């Protein structure tokens, strides 16, 4: 995550739930290999069993659909992506996952409800397998699970 505040909250939650999680403070768009991150952060394994991401996915054209309390309290950096390349973060994270997922590893994404088909196609084109598109409680496309 690019937000130190978000990572501090995530670390607090991990500690409270007694789970060990490696959180990384970096701009994913400027990272080509997770192993190449500065070792001063902490030692990262060369491969991960699970990668989970909820990247920015709300397009500017969908901004009017966002509830006021979300717009008022959520950082816009965490919500919005340019209309011209709405799958930018998914592409980058998936490319990193191809290099850094263990052979039986899984990639999970929360997705834009309007871009389920496009996100599945992106992952298929990159070579992912066992792609599952899941719906939320309202019947909207919301999550993808896949493997390499």
Protein language model regions, located:
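Residue-level signal for inorganic ion chemistry
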Residues: 10, 54, 70, 93, ...
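Alpha/beta-hydrolase-fold catalytic nucleophile elbow
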Residues: 54, 73, 110
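Structural signal for short hydrophobic segments within the conserved structured cores
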Residues: 22-24, 77-78, 132
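Compositionally biased, intrinsically disordered low-complexity segments enriched in Pro/Arg/Gln/His
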Residues: 43-44
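Short, functionally important structural connectors and interaction interfaces within domains
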Residues: 20, 50, 62, 71-72, ...
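Conserved SAM/SAH cofactor-binding pocket of Class I
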Residues: 1-38, 47-65
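Conserved Class I SAM-dependent methyltransferase catalytic core
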Residues: 83-147
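Mobile active-site "lid"/loop adjacent to the S-adenosyl-L-methionine
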Residues: 57-88
């Amino acid at each position: 995550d690019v937000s130190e505040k978000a990572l501090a909250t995530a670390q607090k939650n991990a500690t409270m739930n007694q789970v060990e999680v490696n959180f990384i403070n970096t701009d994913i768009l400027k990272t080509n290999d997770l192993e190449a991150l500065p070792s001063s952060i902490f030692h990262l394994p060369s491969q991960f069993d699970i990668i989970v991401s909820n990247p920015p996915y709300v397009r500017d054209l969908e901004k009017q659909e966002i509830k006021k309390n979300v717009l008022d309290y959520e950082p816009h950096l965490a919500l919005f992506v340019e209309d011209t390349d709405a799958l930018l973060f998914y592409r980058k994270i998936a490319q990193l996952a191809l290099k850094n997922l263990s052979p039986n590893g899984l990639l999970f994404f929360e997705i834009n409800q309007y871009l389920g088909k496009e996100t599945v196609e992106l992952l298929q084109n990159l070579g992912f397998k066992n792609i599952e598109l899941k719906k939320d409680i309202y019947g909207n496309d919301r999550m993808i699970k896949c493997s390499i």
